[in-house]
Amino acid sequence: MKNFIRAGAVVILMTGCQKIAEQQHPSSSSDSPTEVSATAVNRVNAVSTTVTTEATLKAAVANAKAGDIITISGTIKLTSTLQLLNSGTSSSKINISGGTLDCSGQPSGSWGVKVNGSWWNVQNIHITKAPDAGIVFQTGGNNYVNNITTDHCGDTGLQVYNGASNVSVNNCHSSENYDAANAGENADGFACKLSSGPGNKFSSCAANHNSDDGWDLYGNPNPVTITGCTSTNNGYGAAGDGNGFKLGSSGQNMHHTITNSSASNNIGWGFTRNGNAKGAVSYSNLTGSGNGKGLIDL
């Protein structure tokens, strides 16, 4: 992401303007996850909408175009999966932020939020009590995720898979996720596994007390980068593996990268290749203590 402005500095002019984003601070070329792209709102007649109900939220999402800003106010109870299917552009992203999505009223097996579109900024949202995964990036790419909290979901809190690529996940927290139907075998804090595309990254995220692993990269056919993340107290229920960071699977030679991260008090390994080729994972400055099987198996 380039040319950022802080979310609080965005001013939306609804018609007849050449530029609809005023910048309070100088632009930066850094990939800062805590700021909204200045170019995300440079479409003339971009719409800024604040929503308070499921109906208005889903209408705003269904009609979203490049540059639009959707703000969730308060708590919205969802009765079905929220689907982000439209796409922004590299210079004019779609933005959704704020509030809590209570997914407890959804049918069994439902994801809380599904993202199949591309070029979204998704930030500052609490997603809770989804019957299955909290938020899934299923397809699409170039989505930017910041300060998302997922908890008490019936599977993984935040998952990237099925070809989804260049998803940048920053400053997110995932905890207390548990799949009761499988005695905790599958509910990770974060997962980027099975079939995700290239270029996916996690930075400054935390996973705590999930029934399976903190991070799960099982079977991923593309390298993943993890930087500055923390994984603690994972693994409970009869079937949870409880690794802090599971970095591959048997038969793979996948060159994931993990740096400056910590794993403590997980019932399995702190950091494990999980059958990935020995030496395939690039790592540095990994710390932690109190893991049931040890700190590093890479």
Cite the ranges covered by each PLM segment:
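Bacterial Sec-dependent N-terminal signal peptides
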Residues: F4-A7, T15-V44
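Acidic, glycine- and Ser/Thr-rich low-complexity intrinsically disordered tracts
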Residues: A21, N42-V47, D68, K278-L298
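Acidic Gly/Asp/Thr-rich repetitive segments characteristic of extracellular carbohydrate-active
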Residues: V36, V41-S73, K77
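Short beta->alpha connector loops
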Residues: A55, T75-L78, A130, G141, ...
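Beta-solenoid repeat scaffold
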Residues: A66-S104, V115-W120
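Extracellular beta-strand/beta-solenoid scaffold signature
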Residues: T81-L85, Q106-K114, K129-V136, H152-Y161, ...
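Right-handed parallel beta-helix
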Residues: K93, S97-T100, S118-K129, G141-G154, ...
